[in-house]
Amino acid sequence: PDDSPMAATVDEKLRLSTTNNHTSAHLMHEALRQVLGEHVTQAGSLVNPDILRFDFTHFEKVSVEQLEEIENIVNSVIRDNIPTDIFETPFQEAIDSGITALFGEKYGDVVRVVKISDFSEELCGGCHVKATGQIGQFRVFSEE
């Protein structure tokens, strides 16, 4: 093995864009549940600096009106500039209190929770904004 020193840096611009999209995924998940119903669950996602793709379960195509309502809900939460609260708690306590977890995901005994006021509360280990106002305008470009 080579013992040469290495230097690593965080690309702040890349991190910020990815962080904005990641928190947006949480907001979109809850907006989908509010508009389409509590049966909606996340089935996958792609979060990168340029785009957010959110895969979810639902039994029919989402209408243009529903997409507009989802977009409006997310943008309202962004405009409200709600602080993001991140904390750790025992897994079973989180589940018992109704915090959203991904089905089939493996979690440890202690989990990290991302809470955005009373709007969204999910288990998550990713990077998030300090307050929703940092995200900027949210747009839905397509639904397939």
What name fits each language-model region?
Residues P1-E144:
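A glycine- and charged-residue-rich anion-binding loop/surface
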